[in-house]
Amino acid sequence: MKNYYLVDEKRKTPVSTWEKISQTFRRSVKLELFVGLFVMMRELLKRNNSATIKYPFEKVKLDNRYRAVHRLMRFIESENERCIGCGLCEKICISNCIRMETSLDENGRKKVGNYSINLGRCIYCGFCAEVCPELAIVHGTEYENAAEQRSYFGYKQDFLTPIDKLKNQVEFEGAGSLRKDADLLVVKTPNYYDVMIERALENQDTQEQGENK
């Protein structure tokens, strides 16, 4: 068995009432107490040294990787929805709070008819944004989503970027987005080199034809 010992063997455990009162008094008038009071008063009397902000008139600037209420993105050029209805976000959701209904349009392409997220159940883990192949669902910076009901659902029209505000849509840089040097990290396949050789030969032929003329 191990031999246990006290950290301070010289200190005796108070037994009588007077010893307990004496121990409490000694601990109360130690130097550490006055040091803490001095630091508190010094910070209190400083000007323009407030540790708080005047919410809601002032708000903390959020980082790009902050995970708040979701957003559904559009393509700026065509104004079409990025979501292809693959259902990966619904399958990977560990809170089981995403529901998606898809159907086929007149061209035989899959379209998303209904899309809902139970914001009261969501834990904002970011898995849905990371698994999305089209960067269609991302996390925004809207965190003021208090509701009176426990099950608070957000629907497709609540998350999707309106067309009139599409010009103000900013690409998401948080969870699920590509790195700025993503192109440099892509491993080039043999087909890439074949294409580059063909392009070089075509450029060479074009230059030779121009010189012959």
Curated annotation (Swiss-Prot):
Keywords: 4Fe-4S, Cell inner membrane, Cell membrane, Iron, Iron-sulfur, Membrane, Metal-binding, NAD, Quinone, Repeat, Translocase, Ubiquinone
Compartment(s) of residence: Cell inner membrane
Required cofactor names: [4Fe-4S] cluster
Disulfide partners: none
Catalyses which reaction(s): a quinone + NADH + 5 H(+)(in) = a quinol + NAD(+) + 4 H(+)(out)
Pfam families: Fer4_7
This protein's GO CC annotations: plasma membrane
GO biological process: aerobic respiration
Amino acids binding [4Fe-4S] cluster 2: C93, C122, C125, C128
InterPro entries documented for this protein: 4Fe4S_Fe-S-bd (IPR017896), 4Fe4S_Fe_S_CS (IPR017900), NADH_quinone_OxRdtase_chainI (IPR010226)
PROSITE patterns in alphabetical order: 4FE4S_FER_1, 4FE4S_FER_2
Coiled-coil segments: none
Residues annotated for [4Fe-4S] cluster 1 binding in this entry: C83, C86, C89, C132
Annotated EC: 7.1.1.-
Membrane topology: Peripheral membrane protein
Top-level taxon of origin: Bacteria
The protein's role, per its UniProt record: NDH-1 shuttles electrons from NADH, via FMN and iron-sulfur (Fe-S) centers, to quinones in the respiratory chain. The immediate electron acceptor for the enzyme in this species is believed to be ubiquinone. Couples the redox reaction to proton translocation (for every two electrons transferred, four hydrogen ions are translocated across the cytoplasmic membrane), and thus conserves the redox energy in a proton gradient.
Subunit structure as annotated in this protein's UniProt entry: NDH-1 is composed of 14 different subunits. Subunits NuoA, H, J, K, L, M, N constitute the membrane sector of the complex.
Similarity field: Belongs to the complex I 23 kDa subunit family.
Protein's name in the database: NADH-quinone oxidoreductase subunit I
